[in-house]
Swiss-Prot record:
GO terms for biological process: chaperone-mediated protein folding; negative regulation of post-translational protein modification; protein stabilization; spermatogenesis. InterPro entries: Collagen_mod_leprecan, Leprecan_dom, TPR-like_helical_dom_sf. This is Cartilage-associated protein. Its main location: secreted. The lineage of its organism: Eukaryota, Metazoa, Chordata, Craniata, Vertebrata. The gene is Crtap. The keyword Nucleotidyltransferase does not apply. Necessary for efficient 3-hydroxylation of fibrillar collagen prolyl residues. Belongs to the leprecan family. Keywords: Extracellular matrix, Glycoprotein, Hydroxylation, Secreted, Signal.
């Protein structure tokens, strides 16, 4: 008995209306390289003006500035990712003279070099020549709040196709919003509404994944592999760009010691980075795809197996087990591959996880470990145990 198919294939119901359709809309004029000069303005100013116009029931003006603010947010996000991606390999600082134990100097030397690179990069990009938005405004965009206002403004402007798309885009982030669900029920009662249900923030890897699963369910193994092998690196690219965008500007509110201040900033960055995987996970048929990266490897290993390509199937199986070591189905698949290794000419290298899987697993695991440590040991002083005497402090440290 050969390897078994991923059960996810039975759960992902890919109807025509559920398939992510690339949403253009407000991004038709968007270009990272040549953003329209007439639209360059501070993101927060554009967003606040849009909401003011919304409150005044000036629907056309509100729509215009909400759409501009969405493009400005994407420009800022893409600009952050561009600079951090290009400066991630900044030339390391030369080793200082003295003992090799000066690791701290080398560390901060690298930090200074990277800061220099980022400063130069940002000086050349228009997104950073504007005043930067507050954290609360950025949070609104991450949670797709502008679409809540857009759908009603579109509706009042009698642009039902865009209202339907905006409502759907918002609901994907807020599936329990009762008012928006009622709005969507009304929209769905209209003739032809299904044609306009699309995610305006969909990513290319989502469409590729849906196509791959459809081909898989139709037993078109080569097509499924082709699309899934495109979806995987496309998702990872978006993931690492999301991590980079988390390293943007920060509001400094507290006056703290040097290391505590650095730790506070880094924990805030970690909070953002840990959310990246969840934020980027596709929502299909109203449900997020669980363990998205692992699921792609599950589909790949079975499709490769169906083509008798065990040299590619085995690494996908091992990659999947990085993320779910207790999965009995995949364990059995791996036993099958091991048993037939001589027949298929498999060597030890075919039973190693793929490099991109290892990198993704290591990054996400280490980020979670660091964040958990910070949550446990770097809480506010008023939440932790107060130690009054030095002897008590030393005893506490020794027991730890």
């Amino acid at each position: 008995m050969g390897p078994r198919s991923p059960t996810a294939a039975l759960l992902v119901l890919l109807c025509v209306g559920c398939a992510p359709t690339p949403g253009r809309g407000q991004y038709e004029r968007y270009s990272f390289r040549s953003f329209p000069r007439d639209e360059l303005m501070p993101l927060e100013s554009a967003y606040r003006h849009a909401l003011d116009q919304y409150s005044g029931e000036h629907w056309a003006e509100s729509v215009g500035y909400l759409e501009v603010s969405l493009r400005l947010h994407r420009l800022l996000r893409d600009s952050e990712a561009f600079c951090h991606r290009n400066c991630s390999a900044a030339t390391p600082a030369p080793a200082p003279a003295g003992p090799a134990s000066h690791a701290e100097l080398r560390l901060f030397g690298s930090v200074l070099r990277r800061a220099q690179c980022l400063k130069r990069c940002k000086q050349g990009l228009p997104a950073f020549r504007q005043s930067q938005p507050s954290r609360s405004v950025l949070a609104d965009f991450q949670q797709r709040e502008p679409y809540k206002f857009l759908q009603f403004a579109y509706f009042k402007a009698n642009d039902l196709p865009k209202a339907i798309a905006a409502a759907h885009t918002y609901l994907l982030k807020h599936p329990d919003d009762e008012m928006m669900k009622r709005n969507m029920e009304y929209y769905k009662s209209l003739p032809g509404a299904e044609d306009h249900i699309k995610d305006l923030e969909t990513k290319s890897y989502e469409s590729l994944f849906v196509r791959a699963v459809r081909a898989y369910n139709g037993e078109n193994w080569r097509t499924s592999i082709s699309d899934m092998e495109l979806a995987l690196p496309d998702f990872l690219k978006a993931f690492y760009e999301c991590l980079a965008a988390c390293e943007g500007s920060r509001e400094i509110k507290d006056f703290k010691d040097f290391y505590l201040s650095i730790a506070d900033h880094y924990v805030e960055v970690l909070e953002c980075k840990i959310r990246c995987e969840e934020t980027l996970t596709p929502v299909i048929g109203g449900y997020p795809v669980e363990k998205f990266v692992a699921t792609m490897y599950h589909y790949l290993q079975f499709a490769y197996y169906k083509l008798n390509d065990l040299k590619n199937a085995a690494p996908c199986a091992v990659s999947y087990l990085l993320f779910d070591q207790s999965d009995r189905v995949m364990q059995q698949n791996l036993v099958y591959y091991q048993y037939h290794r001589d027949k298929w000419g498999l060597s030890d290298e075919h039973f190693q996880p793929r490099p991109e899987a290892v990198q993704f697993f290591n990054v996400t695991t280490l980020q979670k470990e660091l964040y958990d440590f910070a949550q446990e040991h770097l809480m506010d002083d008023d939440e932790g145990e107060v130690v009054e005497y030095v002897d008590d402090l030393l005893e506490t440290e020794e027991s730890a």
